[in-house]
């Protein structure tokens, strides 16, 4: 099976969409995702003629070992033949760590199928479940690979019958998850059925693997596996790898069970496209039409030291060529594609064009970020929709300040931070204008540790960091009366009340169902049906800011209000960025403008007059409505031997946590709990100590919750002191002068 291909050969395969498969490998940490993709790359990665000369003597992987790096391509293309027909299989990199938001990882959006890797000994873990759920929500078809089967023989010393029982139990567990999370029409069709061949058993490290049909065809039994490992003879294991090579088993299963892009887009576009399904663009995507308008979903932005920013994404419709003018829907920018390339193995090779259904790499889209939708420029003003609105549910909750160890490295550090924040949209980089500090905010302690490690490893920048600071939000618990906000010149008056948004409204905005720019009648209908709003009031929502605060214009017939509305809304957004308690962002506030008196002369009603008027009225209302701070909570998922449950529960309660659920599986307990992020900094070492190092756990952002009243004042004072604010809390009168 020659893998040495010219770009033309690969392109001609890509043009026949029935010969393309887009897949990803998803797994819990350490279950063998990297080993699996490395094994596939070594055995089936397409090698271009240029690389072939060098690569004949050296496998890709040994090239990597010589350079001492792991080639982390956003995509790797593989080649496999079945019955004389060649196929291109795009293996798309999915991030190894759970995207803490539980929000669907962007890379799943461009897959049609996933290989779910499970460790034969550890079984289905939290993350396996999270990622499987996410892929089913995106209508990505799973196939199963039970890896490390050798551990069942070497460590657990099981007999062939016991091995089969253990594997069947695992398949049942995966099928239960599919039954739970898949939509009705896929529940049965996508179940794992060994006799059909959509599950592979094997060892990626030892390079062997088979499905039931392959085992029958080649006459391999589980007793052969047991014998190969029990004998202690390495050549027996190698012989197994020659008889049933893992890459053949996996790629054959992928070609057979994962749909081609055209078949997949028919049922996936209605689920993942957030625009009108009757539009030309949606129809072209549903048919994966290479002659339709260009639609590209960008799933990955990487910084290439030689080429600059490389956008990798899937062409859902049209054909991408260099020189095309395209429109970035979320960034609202026009950009020009300077160069188009395709992936061969892990390397990028220049191409004239990439047709619909395939994965492309493009240069020139430096304003794009992962999650962006790029469309043909002629749809610039058509409000076509996109694959994803730009906010992530998991807002950054922990901040540290960073400075370079060596002051000479300041510019290098700034550049590295900018590149990191492009590659990871959940990482926020800010400069504190007053102190000149560089602040780095992330989804949790672990997330920041990983980012600092990348700074050092990828960019060679050593930094000194401050102790972590937890990010809070300010909010209120009751409704205020109407307050008058005056402008400094006393010529403009705004009459405003505030009240807390209910949980349903917050959820609808957080998950992107309600967006600022949607049709007001549609918004009002959803809010009335799902969040108890009054329809007429909901129609008057004129702004929603990034921290989930809403501005309602309930006035009627106020002179000159139209001309200054934009300024008032700008004032509202600014006020929401720093609340009165501790200058932390405000969250979950409904601001209602009831009436206004606006000066007729534009010179007397500019931002300098209206910003303070808006802010004063909002803050006066805020301080009378039982103000509070919200703190971020983390969800913990812990697996620990039963003997240590008491100790572990003790750690959780000591940290103001609460246990939500506890189940027992054999001798292992699975504990789900919530703890405040502010209490989580020493968590890892304490859990290890409490369980003699035998607890496994994962964390993800859970929700915002009010700080307990007994701690509230203390927390506010500490934040004020850190920010250099006066000790006295502001009073209502301060805003009514």
Curated annotation (Swiss-Prot):
Underlying gene: fusA
A Pfam cross-reference name: EFG_C
Domain of life: Archaea
Protein name, UniProt field: Elongation factor 2
GO CC field: cytosol; ribonucleoprotein complex
Species annotation: Sulfurisphaera tokodaii (strain DSM 16993 / JCM 10545 / NBRC 100140 / 7)
Keywords: Cytoplasm, Elongation factor, GTP-binding, Nucleotide-binding, Protein biosynthesis
Matching PANTHER family: ELONGATION FACTOR-LIKE GTPASE 1 (PTHR42908:SF3), TRANSLATION ELONGATION FACTOR-RELATED (PTHR42908)
SUPFAM superfamilies membership: EF-G C-terminal domain-like, P-loop containing nucleoside triphosphate hydrolases, Ribosomal protein S5 domain 2-like, Translation proteins
């Amino acid at each position: 099976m020659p893998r040495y291909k010219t770009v033309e050969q690969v392109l001609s395969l890509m043009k026949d969409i029935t010969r393309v498969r887009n897949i990803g490998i998803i797994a819990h940490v350490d279950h063998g995702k990297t080993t699996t993709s490395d094994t596939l790359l070594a055995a089936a990665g397409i090698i271009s003629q240029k690389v072939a000369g060098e690569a004949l003597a050296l496998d890709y992987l040994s090239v990597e070992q010589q350079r001492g790096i792991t080639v982390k391509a956003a995509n790797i293309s593989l080649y496999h033949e079945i019955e004389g027909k060649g196929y291109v299989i795009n293996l798309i990199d999915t991030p190894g760590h759970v995207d803490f938001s539980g929000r669907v990882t962007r890379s799943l959006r461009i897959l049609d199928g996933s290989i779910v890797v499970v460790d034969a000994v550890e079984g289905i873990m939290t993350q396996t479940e999270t990622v499987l759920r996410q892929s089913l929500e995106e209508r990505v078809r799973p196939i199963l690979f039970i890896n490390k089967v050798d551990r069942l023989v070497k460590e657990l010393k099981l007999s062939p019958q016991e091995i089969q029982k253990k594997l069947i139990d695992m398949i049942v567990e995966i099928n239960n998850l599919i039954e739970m999370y898949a939509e009705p029409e896929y529940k049965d069709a996508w179940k794992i059925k060994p006799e059909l061949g959509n599950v592979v058993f094997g060892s990626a490290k030892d390079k062997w693997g088979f499905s039931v049909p392959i085992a029958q065809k080649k006459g391999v039994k589980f007793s052969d596996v047991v014998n190969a490992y029990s004998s202690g003879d390495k050549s027996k294991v190698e012989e197994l790898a020659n008889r049933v090579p893992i890459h053949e088993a996996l790629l054959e299963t992928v070609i057979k069970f994962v749909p081609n892009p055209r078949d997949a887009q028919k049922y996936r576009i209605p689920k993942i496209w957030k625009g009108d399904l009757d539009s030309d663009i949606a129809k072209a995507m549903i048919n994966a039409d290479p002659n339709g308008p260009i639609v590209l979903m960008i799933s990955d932005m990487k910084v290439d030291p030689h080429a600059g920013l490389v956008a990798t994404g899937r062409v859902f419709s049209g054909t991408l060529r260099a020189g095309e003018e395209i429109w970035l829907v979320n960034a609202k920018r026009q950009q020009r594609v300077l160069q188009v390339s395709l992936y061969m193995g892990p390397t990028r090779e220049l191409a004239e064009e990439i047709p619909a259904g395939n994965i492309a790499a493009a240069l020139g889209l430096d304003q794009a970020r992962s999650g962006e939708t790029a469309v043909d420029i002629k749809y610039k003003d058509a409000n076509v929709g996109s694959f994803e609105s730009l906010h992530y549910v998991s807002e950054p909750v922990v901040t540290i300040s960073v400075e370079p160890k060596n002051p000479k490295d300041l510019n290098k550090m700034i550049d590295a931070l900018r590149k990191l924040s492009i590659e990871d949209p959940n990482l926020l980089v800010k400069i504190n204008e007053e102190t000149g500090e560089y602040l780095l905010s992330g989804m949790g302690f672990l997330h920041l540790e990983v980012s600092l490690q990348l700074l050092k490893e990828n960019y060679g920048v050593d930094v000194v960091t401050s102790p972590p600071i937890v990010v809070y939000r300010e909010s209120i618990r009751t409704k205020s009366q109407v307050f008058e906000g005056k402008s400094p010149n006393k010529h403009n008056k705004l009459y405003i009340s505030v009240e807390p948004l209910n949980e349903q409204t917050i959820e609808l905005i957080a998950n992107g169902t309600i967006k600022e720019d949607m049709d007001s009648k549609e918004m009002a209908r959803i809010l009335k049906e799902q969040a108890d709003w009054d329809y007429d009031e909901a129609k008057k929502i004129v702004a929603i800011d990034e921290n989930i605060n809403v501005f309602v214009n309930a006035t009627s017939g106020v002179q000159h209000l139209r001309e200054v509305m934009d300024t008032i809304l700008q004032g509202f957004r600014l006020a929401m960025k720093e609340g009165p308690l501790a200058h932390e962002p405000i969250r979950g506030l409904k601001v209602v403008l009831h009436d206004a008196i606006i000066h007729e002369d534009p010179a007397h009603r500019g931002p300098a007059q209206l910003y303070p008027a808006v802010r004063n009225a909002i803050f006066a209302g805020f301080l009378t409505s039982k103000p509070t701070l919200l703190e971020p909570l983390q969800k913990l998922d812990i697996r620990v031997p039963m003997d240590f449950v008491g100790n572990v529960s003790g750690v959780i309660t000591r940290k103001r946590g609460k246990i939500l659920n506890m189940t027992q599986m054999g001798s292992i307990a699975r504990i789900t709990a919530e703890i405040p992020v502010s209490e989580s900094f020493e968590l890892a070492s304490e859990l290890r100590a409490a369980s003699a190092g035998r607890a496994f756990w994962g964390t993800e952002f859970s929700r915002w919750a009010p700080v307990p009243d007994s701690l509230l004042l203390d927390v506010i004072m500490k934040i004020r002191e850190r920010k250099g604010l006066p000790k006295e809390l502001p009073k209502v009168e301060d805003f009514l002068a």
